[in-house]
Amino acid sequence: GEEIAIIGVENWGSISRFPRRGRLDLATKNTDDLPVKLLLSHDPSHWRAQVLPDYKQIDVMFSGHTHGMQFGVRAENFQWSPIEYIYPEWAGLYRQGDQQIYVNVGYGFLGYPGRLGILPEITIFELKASADPSLQKKA
């Protein structure tokens, strides 16, 4: 079995009213030799602000924070919520180059105790090695 790095940081947000406590430099220390790096960071704005430009070694970031604004439309091939004007990555899976982010819209609420069009979400990921050797990362 391969080893993976599960990296977690405290909140880091690009909007000034949210604190920037997450320290990726410390959290990724001693992970260079691990072939797969997964990051848990609450605020999806962390992805564009630091992960994409400065931490290319992080394969996937898992995030939340947006709640999908508790209002919007999600269909098989379409999703919209006013929150996308603040957070470009606000619900579901996004990719840029070899990196990915998954933003979970959460189960709870903020303010109004309900949701319209954005259902509560619990996500389960199953990690498996690829059978295709060209997709397997080299350490």
PLM regions: where:
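Soluble catalytic domains of enzymes that build or remodel membrane lipids, polysaccharides, and related
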Residues: G1-A139
